[in-house]
From Swiss-Prot:
Subunit structure and binding partners: Homodimer.
InterPro entries: ICDH/IPMDH, IsoCit/isopropylmalate_DH_CS, IsoPropMal-DH-like_dom, TTC_DH
Function in brief: Has multiple catalytic activities. Apart from catalyzing the oxidation of (+)-tartrate to oxaloglycolate, also converts meso-tartrate to D-glycerate and catalyzes the oxidative decarboxylation of D-malate to pyruvate.
One cellular component (GO) term of this entry: cytoplasm
Magnesium in keyword set: yes
Cofactor note: Binds 1 Mg(2+) or Mn(2+) ion per subunit.
Needed cofactors: Mg(2+); Mn(2+); K(+)
Pathway entry: Carbohydrate acid metabolism; tartrate degradation; 2-hydroxy-3-oxosuccinate from L-tartrate: step 1/1; Carbohydrate acid metabolism; tartrate degradation; 2-hydroxy-3-oxosuccinate from meso-tartrate: step 1/1; Carbohydrate acid metabolism; tartrate degradation; D-glycerate from L-tartrate: step 1/1
Protein name (database record): Tartrate dehydrogenase/decarboxylase
Ligand binding (Mn(2+)): 225, 250, 254
């Protein structure tokens, strides 16, 4: 019998989040049943543009108090620009979660699966398998700044970037700790110290200082422009890529999955490693209002994000790790069989793909 029950706040959000999140829960429940895990899901209807239209805000005032009692947040997608401007929907929900729950680690796995046509020539399964570790609360995505002389010819816009020693060091430590557990044990630091004369030389200095504590982990630093080029030309050289710049990380974490064939299956985790607050797990894709209601949304990213959630919650518990591995194996087999949605060349519906992965998982040895 399960020794501990994890409580999970399920927030579908907008658009296809409403369609893919139930499939993620379906597969998580199948994994829990197989491996003797106890998961409890409660669904919240806020953090959506429809809620904003009804209440004038994305979430209730006590949202943090409600969610603090949960171990994790399983999130679908947010934004519907025809209803609510993006900066309102994102800053009123997802970015609040990241900052107020100190989810300072953003994890974006990048992996080429069998059966997924690679966008890069002559790449095979195993050539692309790395992780982007992105600082999630600082960098360029701050709300510090303003507009001077607004609506005149002398208008000036200032947007500040924030890099703190605490923020820089803790994301570096997470990245080096992660690399130490991986087979290749290599960290690549994304920088631009030849162009950004203050923040990036500081980042380079802290990276070198952190690396000194990890003699068994090799590392290098690459400027963001050539790093993007090498994602395309030499993806096999990467293992753990660490980024303090939120802007650089945002770009790399979409470029990586695109190089591996599709952003449509890419997962992400927003972690508070100390577990003082719930961590959040979500697909990289957005709410895709244009396909909402057509039952063709790809649920794989949602399901893969659920696997990341189990791995994090388990804290090394073999049952949770096996459940994570089974979910990935089931995803891999379903993709290889061609049992996928139209965006990947298949004919299955959202629910049919979710059912196929759930059934495949149940049959794994």
């Amino acid at each position: 019998m399960p020794a501990h029950s994890f409580r999970i706040a399920a927030i579908p959000g907008d658009g296809i989040g409403l369609e893919v999140l139930p499939e993620g829960i379906r597969v998580l429940e199948a994994a829990a049943l197989k491996h003797g895990l106890a998961l409890e899901f409660d669904t919240f209807e806020w953090a959506s543009c429809d809620y904003y239209l009804q209440h004038g805000k994305m979430m209730p005032d006590d949202w943090a108090e409600q969610l603090k009692q949960y171990d994790a947040i399983y999130f679908g997608a947010v934004d519907w620009p025809d209803k609510v401007p993006d900066h309102i929907s994102l800053w009123g929900s997802l970015l609040k979660f990241r900052r107020e729950f100190d989810q300072y680690v953003n994890i974006r796995p990048v992996r080429l699966f069998p059966g997924v046509p690679c966008a890069l020539a002559n790449r095979k399964v195993g050539d692309i398998d790395f992780v982007v570790v992105r600082e999630n609360t600082e960098g360029e995505y701050s709300s510090l700044g303003g507009i001077m002389f607004e609506n005149t010819e002398n208008e000036i816009v200032i947007q500040e970037s924030i890099f703190t020693r605490r923020g820089v060091d803790r994301i570096l430590k997470y990245a080096f700790d992660l690399a130490e557990k991986r087979e290749r044990k290599h960290v690549t630091s994304a920088t631009k110290s030849n162009g950004m004369a203050i923040s990036m030389p500081y980042w380079d200095k802290r990276t070198e200082a952190m690396a000194a504590h990890y003699p068994h982990v090799s590392w290098d630093k690459q400027h963001i422009d050539i790093l993007c080029a090498r994602f395309v030309l030499q993806p096999e050289r990467f293992d753990v890529v660490v980024v303090a710049s939120n802007l650089f990380g945002d770009i790399l974490s979409d470029l990586g999955p695109a190089c591996a064939g599709t952003i449509g299956i890419a997962p992400s985790a927003n972690l508070n490693p100390e577990r003082n607050f719930p961590s959040l797990f979500e697909p990289v894709h957005g709410s895709a209002p244009d396909i909402f209601g057509k039952n063709i949304a790809n649920p794989i990213a949602m399901i893969w994000s659920g696997a990341l959630m189990l791995e994090f919650l388990g804290q090394g518990d073999e049952r949770y790790q096996r459940a994570h591995d089974d979910m990935l194996n089931a995803i891999e087999r379903v993709i290889a069989d061609g049992s996928v949605t139209p965006d990947m060349g298949g004919t299955l519906s959202t629910q049919q793909v979710g059912a196929a992965i759930s059934d495949t998982l149940a049959r794994l040895d």
